[in-house]
């Protein structure tokens, strides 16, 4: 049986365009989160917002499980009316497509690895996986 590949060309092109559109939308969401986080960090300046860290330091941190496994990267900081951080928006490690969840500041501890300042949690990747997706506006 001979298959005419040309018949499928429009379908393959459509699929490729759909994938591209999904990637573009993901990139736009990520860019928007990053821009808002950077603006907020700039406004906070050198003022510690949680755990003795500035907002910029929190944004540079990775979230680690107790065993050192990377759980995700901090993408944004949610603050209360007084400017204190209450939770972190993280991009879950190795998620595809990118998945974002919010975790509370309570229960996190500062961990220094070389020149890196990260945050340790008692949560596991299974715990992170069971959290609801964060609502991103």
Regions found by a protein language model. Name each.
Residues 2-14, 22-137:
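Peripheral interaction segments used for macromolecular assembly
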